[in-house]
């Protein structure tokens, strides 16, 4: 997850339960980044990660590495960025590098640059994604970059998804939407409830949110909830850019009112698999237990 949907408590609880909690550091003030990392450290002694969107926030790299996270999570590098140099700086600090890719070409680039883990992200996911389905991109990448470990991302929310990713050759999964719908996630209650109530069909790939923020993501669309606000601005992105300040002010009022249908909510199709808001640690343990039971059952049927 990126900035705004994570905090130190969420990352700490995920790691403490046996996952890898990741703090989103992009577009976050330096002092807040340090605070989130320290909050996670107060909860757990287990490894944590910090995520940077390289196209926009490479300048934060030194600050993040000074805090000595066990894992540097990266994504969305520009073509002109030196991934090998960035990854080498992380390795020199003692961190492992986990890089997310939406295409096979980017997977090869990350592997050549020295990534320790590659996250193959499918278009099913929430937030900024590529255009290849999760099933295909995960299998493509696991075959192409072996023996580099691969995680699947986009559309995963339960133990069955984890078992499926393992069957595709991945070593695990990265979850975004599932952890937004947790007690610790620092988003409004209406946002979490919208995920729980979603059937997975009410999302859309769009550039509306980027037109509003003014950020140009390299080769990405954003999957968001198809709210009335999004419907209103689909196809009107140039006007939205011109009226950015005015519309931002209205959205801030929406947050205060808790009006989900006049907001932007980044979540993926896995929302259709989520039916409750739970503690993050409970989510981690439940997914692991479900996957173990599924794989145990499959082994027994094969005997």
Question: What kind of region is each of these model predictions?
Answer:
Residues 1-149:
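Active-site entrance/lid segments in N-terminal catalytic domains of soluble metabolic enzymes
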Residues 100, 154-155:
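Conserved acidic functional residues
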Residues 131-151, 157-303:
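Conserved active-site-proximal phosphate/metal-binding subdomains
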């Amino acid at each position: 997850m990126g900035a705004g949907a994570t905090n130190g408590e969420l990352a700490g609880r995920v790691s403490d339960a046996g996952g890898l909690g990741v703090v989103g550091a992009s577009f976050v003030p330096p002092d807040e980044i340090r605070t989130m990392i320290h909050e996670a450290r107060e909860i757990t002694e287990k490894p944590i990660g910090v995520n940077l969107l390289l196209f926009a926030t490479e300048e934060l790299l030194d600050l993040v590495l000074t805090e000595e996270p066990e894992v540097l999570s990266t994504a969305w590098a520009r073509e002109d960025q030196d991934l090998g140099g960035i990854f080498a700086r992380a390795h020199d600090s003692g961190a492992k590098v986990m890089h997310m890719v939406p295409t096979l070409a980017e997977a090869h680039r990350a592997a050549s640059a020295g990534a320790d883990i590659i996250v193959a992200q499918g278009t099913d996911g929430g937030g900024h994604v590529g255009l290849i389905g999760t099933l295909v991109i995960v299998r493509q990448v696991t075959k192409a970059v072996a023996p580099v470990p691969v995680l699947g991302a986009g559309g995963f929310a339960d133990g069955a998804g984890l078992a499926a990713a393992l069957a595709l050759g991945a070593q695990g999964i990265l979850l975004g939407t599932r952890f937004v719908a947790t007690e610790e996630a620092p988003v409004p209650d209406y946002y979490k409830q919208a995920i729980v109530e979603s059937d997975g069909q009410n999302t859309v790939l769009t550039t509306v949110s980027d037109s509003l923020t003014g950020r140009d993501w390299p080769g990405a669309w954003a999957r968001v909830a198809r709210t009335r606000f999004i419907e209103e601005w689909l196809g009107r992105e140039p006007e939205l850019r011109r009226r950015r300040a005015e519309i931002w002010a209205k959205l801030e009022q929406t947050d205060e009112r808790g009006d989900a249908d006049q907001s932007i909510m980044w979540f993926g199709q896995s929302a259709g698999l989520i039916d409750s808001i739970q503690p993050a640690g409970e989510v981690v343990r439940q997914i692991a237990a479900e996957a173990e039971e599924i794989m145990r059952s499959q082994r027994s049927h094969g005997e």
